[in-house]
Structures are given as structure tokens and as C-alpha cells.
Amino acid sequence: MRSDLYTIAFTTIITVILGLGLSATADSLRERQVLNEELDIKKNILSVLGYKQDTPWTNEEVQSLYDANISEIRIDEVGSVIEELDKNEDVSYTIYQSSENDKVTGYAIPIAGKGLWGTMYGYFAIEPDAETVKGITFYKHKETPGLGAEVDKDWFKNNFVGKKLTNKNGELVSIEVIKGYVSDTDPDAPHKVDGISGATITGTGLTTFLKSDLQKYEPYFAKVRSVNQIESL
């Protein structure tokens, strides 16, 4: 009887110890996973804003570069900066502003929407003038390799650089991914990029959700353009 009680007690203690150990390990792995995801996001933001180097960044370099150059601005749906985030705030959007020597060098916003096979996630960067494209990047998608998956290739992303988000009247028109190639004689060429052969649905999806996301931030960037215009006088 005593032997049975000892066995039960011993087994219970070992089970509890192993359970606590596994729980602690799982918590540690989750924390590390969350940290890696946060660093990957920061790396993508830095990259789309033009921060690059020949060798891969270490985690410490990513964090240091981000802390030194990127500030997060939260705005409401009318483009006003939210100084203190209210838990009851219905809508808020985040802008990642890059600066060097107290001078704004660009803005990045998160973008996401449906491609052919699922949701595409990325970041879109805008020059300090709030109307010229600085860059675009995608970090997660389910598009077909060799077709829609070309969205994360340099040749496609580079097509966006220098394009204009607004027309001559200063109105947001966004960027359209067309089928085929953009003609130099097209008056709307500044607002269009070459499409991906065989991936029309991916391009159409990108065109749609990019404009939708930009419209959320337009009240803020319209104010930036107004300030820039006044300062240039």
C-alpha cells in the first residue's frame, strides 16, 4: 500500500514538473516567435523606405536602425494625429515616418488585399512630398510562382518607384497595374505600371486594394502636401 502511494506521488510530482517545463518552453518559443515577427516587420519597413546594405542585417542592427530613424504616427479617419491612443477609438491607422537629421525622408503604410489565391500583405512607401512613390514590398502572399508571385521581385517593385499618386489637380488617383506595358505616350503613364504576364487577377487585385488603402491615409497626406506647398512659396 505504501509502495503504491509512493509511486502515485512520485508520478504526480514528475508529471507536474514536466508540465511546468513544457509550458515554460512553449511560452519562451512563443515570445521568440513574436519577437522575430516584429523584427521582420521592422526589416520590411526599413527596406521599403530605402534602408539597405550589402550583408544581411542582424536583429540588433534592425532594432537599432529602426529606433534611430523610424517614428510611428497614428491618425484617425480624418487625418488628425492621435497623440494618445484611446482604447475606445473606433478607427486608427499607422504611418511609419523615416527621418534623418530631423528631416523627413519618407512615409510607409501597411497594405493588404486579395490577390488570386489569398490575401497579399506588404508595405507601400511615399516620398516626403506625399505624392511620389518611394517603394513597395510584399512579405506574405499565396500567389503562383513565376506568375503572380512576381509581385515581390525587384523588376516589378522597381516599376512603382517615381510614379505619381495624384493628378495635376492634386487629387488621389493611386497606381494602376495594367495588362501589358505602359506606353510613354499615355498621358496617365505616371499613374500606371507594367503588369505581370499571366497574372491579370493579381494585378487587378493589387490595383484595387492599393487605392483603397491609400484612401484611408489620404486626409493626412493631403495636409502634408498643403504644408509642403505653403513652405515652397
For each of these PLM feature ranges, what is it?
Residues R2-L233:
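Flexible, solvent-exposed loop/hinge segments and secondary-structure transition points
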